[in-house]
């Protein structure tokens, strides 16, 4: 049984949560996020806490219970504090720059790689570190993965785009015969 679903989500000041049928609407200022549960879990707000109740006793309902609780918690954290991912660029001549709403990457190709920055996401570049900030955890992770995919780190010299906390397992190069 899910132990994650049992935990109530405390709603911080500044973030407002309302239940509209099977939807939970979270708002903070002009930002609004909606989580649709499709009636799979019971919803209740009491004492500044959001409580999700088990929808049924089958295994599927128990899985949904923990999943929707985690998704709702990510929305609350995203609206109150936000999420950040950092990428590092390693390689001679590899650069990144933000030009308007486009991230321009020079990754050793014959052409620059342009990545359109979606609304609600901030991307900052400082030397060889790309910082991605936003309120949607899934979107931030997806953007970081898409940028990394342009030039994943290679195992011989470590050149490419990698997550800042990622370790690259290096391989030894060819050895000469004597």
Swiss-Prot record:
GO terms for cellular component: cytosolic large ribosomal subunit. Keywords: Ribonucleoprotein, Ribosomal protein, RNA-binding, rRNA-binding. The keyword Membrane does not apply. Pfam families: Ribosomal_L6. GO terms for molecular function: rRNA binding; structural constituent of ribosome. The keyword Ribosomal protein applies. InterPro entries: Ribosomal_uL6-like (IPR000702), Ribosomal_uL6-like_a/b-dom_sf (IPR036789), Ribosomal_uL6_a/b-dom (IPR020040), Ribosomal_uL6_bac-type (IPR019906), Ribosomal_uL6_CS (IPR002358). One of its GO terms (biological process) is cytoplasmic translation. This protein binds to the 23S rRNA, and is important in its secondary structure. It is located near the subunit interface in the base of the L7/L12 stalk, and near the tRNA binding site of the peptidyltransferase center. Part of the 50S ribosomal subunit. PANTHER family: 60S/50S RIBOSOMAL PROTEIN L6/L9, LARGE RIBOSOMAL SUBUNIT PROTEIN UL6M. NCBIfam families: L6_bact. Belongs to the universal ribosomal protein uL6 family. This is Large ribosomal subunit protein uL6. It comes from Wolinella succinogenes (strain ATCC 29543 / DSM 1740 / CCUG 13145 / JCM 31913 / LMG 7466 / NCTC 11488 / FDC 602W).
